[in-house]
Design a protein with these regions (language model features):
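Conserved ABC transporter NBD signature motif
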Residues: 14-22
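Conserved catalytic motifs of ABC-family nucleotide-binding domains
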Residues: 113
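Catalytic Walker B motif of ABC-type/P-loop ATPase nucleotide-binding domains
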Residues: 117-120
């Protein structure tokens, strides 16, 4: 599902619309443009191990905008503050706990204020304390950005605390 929404896989049947665009009719350039309007929080964060937390969050801004360094600095610190980690900007991924790494990855995912956020198992591998520490920022950031979020997870209990709607998918079909 997430691969189709992200444009990595074409729909085999029917029509899939993402941020108002019919995915099956888009060329590669249009798919890349559509992807700039969305972001993804990967299951285990996927932070660049040789970059600090600050540099991980700044990466997209440097790659996809022409913002000045001073503006990037302010925005990165704002994104880290939004996930409760402004003071961790200098830390390397190896110095972060699992919950902290997931929150840095969340700050990186929201760096460009996406319209659509996708989360791949955001609660996987987290201890009970870290579960709530990642769940609440997901909900707050979704509301603040006015974004649509899609959370793929097996952790129904945690999901119910932060979602507006829940769909159950089995064997490629929505069952509830």
């Amino acid at each position: 599902l997430q691969r189709t929404i992200g444009g990595a896989r074409r729909p085999s049947l029917g029509e899939v619309r993402v941020v108002g665009q019919p995915l099956g009719r888009l060329d590669q350039r249009q798919i890349y443009a559509m992807r700039r309007r969305m972001s993804m929080l990967f299951q285990f964060g996927a932070l660049f191990t040789d970059m600090s937390s600050f540099e991980n969050v700044a990466f997209q801004m440097r790659e996809h905008t022409k913002l000045e360094d001073s503006m990037i600095r302010d925005l990165v610190l704002m994104k880290l503050h939004a996930v409760g980690l402004r003071g961790a900007a200098h830390l390397m991924p190896s110095e972060l706990s699992g919950g902290m790494a997931r929150r840095v990855a969340l700050a990186r995912a929201i760096a460009l204020d996406p319209e659509l956020m996708m989360y791949d198992e955001p609660f996987a591998g987290l201890d009970p304390i870290s579960l709530s520490v990642i769940g609440q920022p997901i909900r707050k950031l979704n509301d603040a950005l006015g974004a649509t979020s899609i959370i793929v997870t097996h952790d129904i209990q945690e999901s119910l605390k932060i979602v507006d709607y829940i769909y159950f998918v089995a064997d490629g079909r929505v069952i509830a």
